[in-house]
From Swiss-Prot:
The family this protein is said to belong to: Belongs to the shikimate dehydrogenase family.
Record keywords, A-Z: Amino-acid biosynthesis, Aromatic amino acid biosynthesis, NADP, Oxidoreductase
Protein name: Shikimate dehydrogenase (NADP(+))
Enzyme Commission (EC) number: 1.1.1.25
HAMAP family: Shikimate_DH_AroE (MF_00222)
Active site residues according to the UniProt entry: K66
Pathway(s) this gene product operates in, as recorded in its UniProt entry: Metabolic intermediate biosynthesis; chorismate biosynthesis; chorismate from D-erythrose 4-phosphate and phosphoenolpyruvate: step 4/7
Gene Ontology molecular function, alphabetical: NADP binding; shikimate 3-dehydrogenase (NADP+) activity
Keyword Amino-acid biosynthesis in annotation: yes
Length: 265
């Protein structure tokens, strides 16, 4: 029986989710269609309702609607609640369920490159993207997790929710880290957060949550120029999609060849 899925966001034309899920479908021999829905700021909640009334099986949610999707759901997973945002929706017993697969997607992609246990980790940015990855990073038992933001107060808001983290302003960063994660939106507008020289001098592994299929993101290019190994978030996109696919279809697809295929476009 044909299953129906979609991703909703605004903008949405650039989304790779339909391509990724169709490759998962071929691999697992599940018949599905996966569409793009341009989100309407005024009618977003109605769009969600209509999708499931019309026999939709699962819906991914991307910017800028993850918080609204979270608020709309009746039942949320623990990781969704801690993230305060939802990217995966489905109906069960006539109730809207929500999950957030971004964090687990990041951890699975990072595991290709380094072990997180006992590492010193720096997150740049204190917005929704940062909040969504703190809990899974803490579960990996790092030695230290610091959230740095241009305005310290916003980072302190996250610290109140996650007391295990430390916070700093960008200017206060002087120590070395094993891993730096860019969770700011700077790369989306080709801007770079210039870090103190000491922070990059020990050549940390650098990871940008943003991705650019055609070229390197500004953060990846900047940190590579500083001599660091750096990757963008395309792998995270594929891994979070795999987790959503598993939630909906109870089958976990393989991701490595799909990621290689997307990198070779």
């Amino acid at each position: 029986m044909l299953r129906r899925f979609a991703v909703i966001g605004n903008p949405i034309a650039h989304s790779l989710s339909p391509v990724i899920h169709q490759m998962f479908a071929q691999q697992t021999q599940i018949e599905l269609i996966y569409e793009k829905i341009l989100g309407d700021d005024v009618k977003f909640e109605q769009q969600i309702s209509d999708f499931f009334i019309q026999y939709g099986n699962g819906l991914n949610v991307t910017l800028p609607y993850k918080k609204r999707a979270y608020e709309l759901a009746k039942i949320r997973t623990q990781r969704c609640t801690l993230a305060g945002a939802a990217n995966t929706l489905w109906m069960e017993e006539n109730q809207l369920h929500a999950d957030n697969t971004d964090g687990v997607g990041l951890i699975r992609d990072l595991s290709r490159f380094l072990e997180l246990k006992d590492k010193k980790i720096l997150i740049l940015g204190a917005g929704g993207a940062a909040r969504g990855i703190i809990f899974p990073l803490l579960e990996a038992k790092p030695l230290q997790l610091i959230v740095a933001n241009r305005t310290l107060e916003k980072a302190k808001e996250l610290q109140r929710q996650f007391p295990q983290i430390n916070v700093a302003s960008f200017a206060e960063l002087t120590e070395f880290f094993d891993l730096i994660i860019n969770a700011t939106s700077a790369s989306l507008s080709d801007q770079v957060i210039v870090l103190p020289e000491e922070v990059l001098s020990h050549k940390p592994f650098c990871y940008d949550l943003a991705y650019n299929q055609k070229t390197s993101t500004a953060f990846v290019q900047y940190t590579r120029n500083g001599g660091c190994e750096a990757v963008d978030g395309l792998g995270m996109l594929v891994e979070q999609a795999a987790e959503a696919f598993f939630i909906w279809n109870k089958v976990m697809p393989s991701t490595q060849k799909i990621l290689e295929h997307l990198r070779s476009f």
